[in-house]
Amino acid sequence: MKKLKLHGFNNLTKSLSFCIYDICYAKTAEERDGYIAYIDELYNANRLTEILSETCSIIGANILNIARQDYEPQGASVTILVSEEPMDPKLIDQTEHPGPLPETVVAHLDKSHICVHTYPESHPEGGLCTFRADIEVSTCGVISPLKALNYLIHQLESDIVTIDYRVRGFTRDVNGMKHFIDHEINSIQNFMSEDMKSLYDMVDVNVYQENIFHTKMLLKEFDLKHYMFHTKPEDLTETERQEITAALWKEMREIYYGRNMPAV
């Protein structure tokens, strides 16, 4: 897309929001309580603040204020207010390509608000536990929150991811013409690294004329030992392993498709 010469500030709002799910099987009530306590501590308010602060660096945001809270019995939330520094538009990369990975983050930039809320969950029957993190990165101006996508998904354990990106409002060029988007985008997937795309089955549902983009991701590889909490698959009977695998896959598909499915 050709560089736009704007009249005044870029008034477009770009919002990236996604849910990240981690699924686990805990055989006993004690194991379920243990998983909830483990995941709640792993993603406490302090750890989430570190992740979001690095996100600010990636998208180019100056932190104005941080509000964080751990909840009882579980869960946490962090909200960061951010602002944008004056930046030379020539230095802003608007091309459609993946953002940095955690180990390659060296950028410094800035913007609007970033927030995350966590929801650990379990049920006394069935042994299934889920952890959900809701994240929203919203910016105003030339910087795209999509640059933080790679980093955030790599930082959180992700069996299932649902992502929404939308551009709202308009900005004017020097001739007074309105522009409702200032960068090219065909798919959110174009902002993901190849190694990430190789790990997931993905589907897009996009409404191009409304500047709304949606991608769903489901982890391809399934290894039962990665889903067990304090129980080894080899300590179970073959029938138990098959039943647990079926229950986990059903849970993951229901979350991925957003509807309950009949038992097979």
From Swiss-Prot:
Which spans of this chain does the record mark as coiled coil? none
Which pathway does this chain act in?
Answer: Amine and polyamine biosynthesis; S-adenosylmethioninamine biosynthesis; S-adenosylmethioninamine from S-adenosyl-L-methionine: step 1/1
Cofactor binding comment, as recorded: Binds 1 pyruvoyl group covalently per subunit.
**Residues carrying the site annotation Cleavage (non-hydrolytic):** K111, S112
Q: Does the keyword Lyase apply?
A: yes
Q: Name one GO molecular function term.
A: adenosylmethionine decarboxylase activity
Task: Name the Enzyme Commission number(s) assigned to this protein.
Answer: 4.1.1.50
In the record, biological process GO terms are: spermidine biosynthetic process
Spell out the catalytic residues: S112, H117, C140
What this protein catalyses is: S-adenosyl-L-methionine + H(+) = S-adenosyl 3-(methylsulfanyl)propylamine + CO2
Q: Does the keyword S-adenosyl-L-methionine apply?
A: yes
Alphabetized, the UniProt keywords read: Autocatalytic cleavage, Decarboxylase, Lyase, Polyamine biosynthesis, Pyruvate, S-adenosyl-L-methionine, Schiff base, Spermidine biosynthesis, Zymogen
Class of the enzyme per the UniProt entry, highest EC level:
lyase
Record note on modification? Is synthesized initially as an inactive proenzyme. Formation of the active enzyme involves a self-maturation process in which the active site pyruvoyl group is generated from an internal serine residue via an autocatalytic post-translational modification. Two non-identical subunits are generated from the proenzyme in this reaction, and the pyruvate is formed at the N-terminus of the alpha chain, which is derived from the carboxyl end of the proenzyme.
InterPro entries named in the record:
AdoMetDC_fam_prok, S-AdoMet_deCO2ase_bac, S-AdoMet_deCO2ase_core
UniProt function note: Catalyzes the decarboxylation of S-adenosylmethionine to S-adenosylmethioninamine (dcAdoMet), the propylamine donor required for the synthesis of the polyamines spermine and spermidine from the diamine putrescine.
What protein am I looking at? S-adenosylmethionine decarboxylase proenzyme
Q: Which organism is it from?
A: Salmonella arizonae (strain ATCC BAA-731 / CDC346-86 / RSK2980)
Question: What's the source species' lineage?
Answer: Bacteria, Pseudomonadati, Pseudomonadota, Gammaproteobacteria, Enterobacterales
